[in-house]
Amino acid sequence: MRRALLPAFVLISVLLEGCATLISEPPEQVVLPYVTNFSYSQPADGMPNGWRPWTLSRFKKATEYKLVKEDGQTVIRARASSSASGLVHPLNLNPAQYPLLHWRWKVDQLIAQADNTRKSTEDAPVRLVISFEGDLEKLEFDDRMFFDQIKAFTGQQLPYATLMYIWGNRLPRDTVLSNPHTSRIKMLVVESGRDRVGRWREEMRNVYEDFKRAFGEAPGRITAIGIMTDTDNTGENVHAYYGDIAFKKVAPPRVVFGAD
């Protein structure tokens, strides 16, 4: 069952990019209950531990991802030029126990023509993509039919739900967008505009609460997380950086002894 995680992530790319070509299934990989830090790797390692390439299509140019040193710490540098691909990390995580997602990223410039409300210009300088398990029998009729069509066409099952955190151009922060093909893929705008371009941004989101807001229900287990920088729709060039990604527990309330 766990071998289907990465192909399922590739299926998400079918919906993101309008492409129906899948990559071959990767070798067996241990599924961890945590995200392996980029900072644990060295630039000479090539690919960060625990992560694998996420190829959207053999007909699309791949974004370049490289381990580099930035301010003395190993991070991922993404360079996109009319390209779209990502890195994916399989997971087995309960978001009810570890609801807080902490990460940092940096964007050197925005994608001028990008508009995440339109399929023809739906690019983003940075994305975090999270897939979730769930009961497929609970899906709406239209979604179930769409899932069945994808499975019949590709032989693989889509994740029950997918939540993406993105950096947009103009949309207000916290805007939630739906995929035009299915209600089971949502985008949430975490950063927007030029004000914070060129600086590392520390982000913290409650994935459990964000999922409930986006999908109207509690999330199932998290099966994978990915990063993606894409400019294939706009044909532009963009550089971006990703730092460590971690799921954390909510800190217990602080007890002050002696207080009235």
Regions found by a protein language model. Give the residues of each.
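Short carbohydrate-recognition loop motifs
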Residues: 63-85
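Bacterial N-terminal signal peptides
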Residues: 7-17
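Extracellular carbohydrate-recognition regions
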Residues: 20-57, 141-148, 257-260
